[in-house]
A protein has these predicted regions:
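Second-shell loop/turn segments in exported
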Residues: 35-43, 109-118, 157-163, 169, ...
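Non-catalytic, structured segments within soluble enzyme domains
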Residues: 1-43, 50, 205, 209-210, ...
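Mid-domain, small-residue-enriched loop/turn segments at the edges of structured enzyme/sensor domains
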Residues: 155-157, 190-238
């Protein structure tokens, strides 16, 4: 007899909750599941689970990628893991933990058990969200895409295209997933002791990225570029993005709502915890930017759900060992990972993870009769122009160097641009017209450093495009 990945997930979650709430050992909880006559009310939606199983069990949908493993004397194929959630209530409505037809019970579930490097998909969670919320930067803030420091004699960090692009808006930096601006924005959030403990604790405790390790607070690479000491799971990453999909409120996940005994008595009640983390305005600024990732970037376009506004973030790790996409529509949130179980490069020219995500999510929306949908813009935002060189209100000399974006009311530029003498440093001062910062908080300061708290660790850049 075989169980689906959904059944495996429910089984393991109920066992864990029986152990925690009833002080059972694992063997006692497992025995209760098999012999206790329990009735479990699942959050899984059979039509969604069916769509995912049908699509991801067909090798024709997963690309023709493979490599020959000499040690095993056989070909191996990239695996896939995907989670689909309702972000408003935390319900897991579909889950797949591997490619192909599933066999057996309680087999390895890559959606909940595989801990992988997230690459750039981590940036909205650990770097930009708090920076928007605390007005450290706006979408129109101008920041340098240039080396932050020398590392082993080389410029660090690098970008996927091997180039640096000079001054640009935060909106452009996040849309294109450029690495140096992300590092600079993280540095604005550094603690007095030189670590990023506050950022780490927020991600681990509030956004429930529980696989993060204490070592991830040290250095710049872990929390800015997703070069973590251990990694994260697909379920963790998908759940964390609920903070944006649910308009600023983080919603924990669940695969069941309650468990009853054979006599109808409630044994477990699974109420999800919700926490207001960001303002609706902050969440919308992120959604607006991540919509552009899907609309404009090479790897993001394939994730577009037909007729429905779609937002999301790609992630790719060094040597293309891991490919991620975490995205959402006004209705559903989903995350996907694609790669080999053992670190081996997948194709860099094709973003299978966004192709799969877009195809599966389009089928799910169509099955639900959803043919359109827009993200709701909250009050408290203004649409304002800015000079793309200074970030100030455009003046007469700014012709050809202007753009529009959303600002939280009160953070939009108010001073007219008076020249193009260089970039404006993002400042912890919520006044967006501030043009200087203290040296220890200046993210545009390039340096050669031997201070361990400033060292990238590890040094490999995220090759995200």
């Amino acid at each position: 007899e075989s169980w689906s990945y959904a059944t495996d997930t429910i089984f393991e979650e109920v066992v864990a909750d029986l152990m925690e709430k009833n002080n059972y050992s694992r063997s006692e909880a497992v025995s209760k599941m098999y012999t206790g006559g329990l009735k479990i009310y699942s959050t899984i939606q059979t039509d969604v689970q069916g769509i995912m199983e049908d699509y991801l069990s067909n090798p024709d949908n997963l690309g023709n990628e493979r490599y020959y493993n000499k040690e095993k004397d056989e070909y191996e194929y990239p695996e896939v893991a995907m989670v689909v959630m309702n972000p408003s209530n935390g319900d897991i409505i579909g889950i797949i933990g591997g490619r192909g037809e599933k066999t057996g019970k309680l087999s390895y579930n890559r959606a909940t058990q595989a801990v992988r490097q997230p690459g750039s998909s981590l940036k909205p969670l650990t770097v930009y969200g708090k920076a928007f919320e605390e007005n450290l930067v706006t979408l129109g803030t101008i920041i340098e895409d240039s080396p932050v420091m020398k590392y082993d004699g080389s410029d660090w960090p690098a970008n996927a295209d091997g180039k640096y692009h000079g001054d640009m808006s935060i909106y452009k930096a996040l849309t294109n997933s450029y690495n140096p601006p992300t590092v600079r924005v993280l540095r604005l959030q550094q603690d007095d002791d030189g670590t990023f403990s506050t950022v780490l604790n927020f991600a681990r405790d509030t956004l429930k990225l529980s696989s993060l390790q204490d070592d991830d607070k040290n250095g710049l690479a872990p929390l800015s570029l997703g070069a973590l000491s251990k990694g994260v799971t697909v379920l963790e990453m998908t759940r964390a993005f609920s903070v944006y999909a649910n308009k600023g409120t983080f919603t924990d996940s669940r695969s069941y709502t309650r468990v009853e005994s054979y006599s109808g008595k409630t044994v477990l009640q699974k109420d999800v915890s919700k926490q207001s983390v960001y303002s609706e305005q902050t969440a919308y600024l992120m959604t607006y930017t991540l919509e552009n990732v899907v609309a404009e970037t090479y790897f993001g376009r394939a994730a577009k759900v037909y007729g429905v506004e779609t937002a999301g973030k790609t992630g790719t790790t060094s040597f293309y060992n891991d490919r991620w996409f975490i995205g959402y529509t006004p209705y559903y949130l989903a995350g996907i990972w694609w790669g080999y179980d053992y670190n081996h490069s997948v194709s860099s020219s094709r973003a299978m993870q966004t192709e799969i995500w877009g195809a599966v999510m389009t089928k799910i929306h169509q099955a639900k009769g959803i043919t359109s949908g827009k993200f709701e813009q909250p009050a408290g935002l203004v649409w304002e122009s800015y000079c793309t060189i200074t970030g100030m209100l455009p003046g007469a000399q700014c012709a050809g160097h202007t753009a529009f974006t959303f600002y939280k009311e009160g953070t939009q530029p108010t001073k007219i641009c008076d020249g193009h003498g260089g970039s404006v440093d993002p400042s912890p001062d919520p006044n967006p017209d501030a043009t200087t910062t203290e040296p220890n908080s200046n993210p545009n300061q390039s340096e050669t450093t031997t201070d361990p708290s400033q060292q990238p660790n590890p040094p490999e850049p995220d090759p995200e495009g």
